[in-house]
Amino acid sequence: QLLGPALGALEVECQTQIDAEGVINSRNPEELLDVFSLLTWVKQTLNMTKIPVPDILTDRVAHIAPVLRCLRHGDGTLARFHGGGQGSEHILDQALAISGVRPSVPQDRAMGFARLNAGATSLIMDVAAPPLGPARFSAHASTCAFELSVGRNRLVVNCGSGLSFGDDWQIASRSTASHATAGIEGLSSSRFSHAKRGHFQALKETPKIVSVQKTE
């Protein structure tokens, strides 16, 4: 009696919270991993109990997998952007295996990030404006910031979320200065407004035009 409504609600959430390219509004890679892990668990459970898997669930899993592969470093962890940490490489590996989505050459762009590869070296860069809507309360001023890894060694990383260290560090970690990118006189590429949700301040005055071009 509860399964039908639960799956119906899940279908609505998949439709409204994840777009057709497997992207969530927050642009937080670790949050996307959490979503992906839960969806693959549901898919596996339905398969084991011979219950049809909703088409929208299968579709979103198929599109999230390559996004997460694009945002992985050589050690299997995720790039730290917009409040996300590195995530668990083991949880990601398990979720990818359960998904059944075969690995391919990583996308060079996904969820507002660009990826470059050369041998064992990979670079992941934020090439979009910070997210708006509710996500603006946790977004970082990280436009044009990057992380760089060689093999399993991460050489250049961002500070990540400072939330666990208190309000002041939470704000500081969201500023441009806490990211691997160029800054001008200590100013952030996006400004903080006075609007708050709990202890979180919203970003405002985000970059209007962010373009990227890849040349061989």
For each feature predicted by the language model, list its residue ranges.
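Alpha-helical cores of eukaryotic small-GTPase signaling modules
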Residues: Q1-G22
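Active-site rim segments in enzyme catalytic domains, especially the processed small/beta chain
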Residues: S142-E205
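Carbohydrate-active enzyme catalytic cores, enriched for enzymes
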Residues: D19-S161
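A short, hydrophobic/aromatic-rich structural module that often spans a beta strand
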Residues: E89-H90, Q94, R174, S178, ...
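Extended, loop-rich substrate-binding clefts of extracytoplasmic carbohydrate-active enzymes
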Residues: R109-S122, S188-E216
